[in-house]
From Swiss-Prot:
It is a single-pass membrane protein. The keyword Acetylation does not apply. The chain crosses the membrane at residues 52-72. This is U24 protein. A motif (PPXY motif) lies at residues 7-10. Late-budding domains (L domains) are short sequence motifs essential for viral particle budding. They recruit proteins of the host ESCRT machinery (Endosomal Sorting Complex Required for Transport) or ESCRT-associated proteins. Contains one L domain: a PPXY motif which is involved in the interaction with Itch, a member of the Nedd4 family. It comes from Human herpesvirus 7 (strain JI) (HHV-7). It is found in: Membrane. Keywords: Membrane, Transmembrane, Transmembrane helix. Down-regulates of the TCR/CD3E complex and the transferrin receptor TFRC in host T-cells by blocking them from recycling back to the cell surface. Interacts with host ITCH; this interaction probably mediates ITCH degradation. Interacts probably with NEDD4.
């Protein structure tokens, strides 16, 4: 009589993946000296670039919404009247 082990559950697989990922992250050379060697100007540049991208997307979205609203208003109320 042989006992077969049941396949691992979904939770077991996810926990193992999370554990493996955590171990991988901690194996990288992330000593405090390495983290502090990143200059504050580099961090500011990354933040500034991210902020610029977000603002650009918001401005484009607002412009497209205004164009859509004006188009709907023009179609509904600005049609040629006899």
């Amino acid at each position: 009589m042989t006992h077969e082990t049941p396949p691992p559950s979904y939770n077991d697989v996810m926990l193992q993946m999370f554990h493996d990922h955590s171990v991988f992250l901690h194996q990288e050379n992330l000593s405090p000296r390495t983290i502090n060697s990143t200059s504050s100007s580099e961090i500011k540049n990354v933040r500034r670039r991210g902020t610029f991208i977000i603002l650009a997307c918001l401005i484009i979205s607002v412009i497209l919404c205004l164009i859509l609203i004006l188009h709907i208003f023009n179609v509904r109320y600005g049609g040629t009247k006899p």
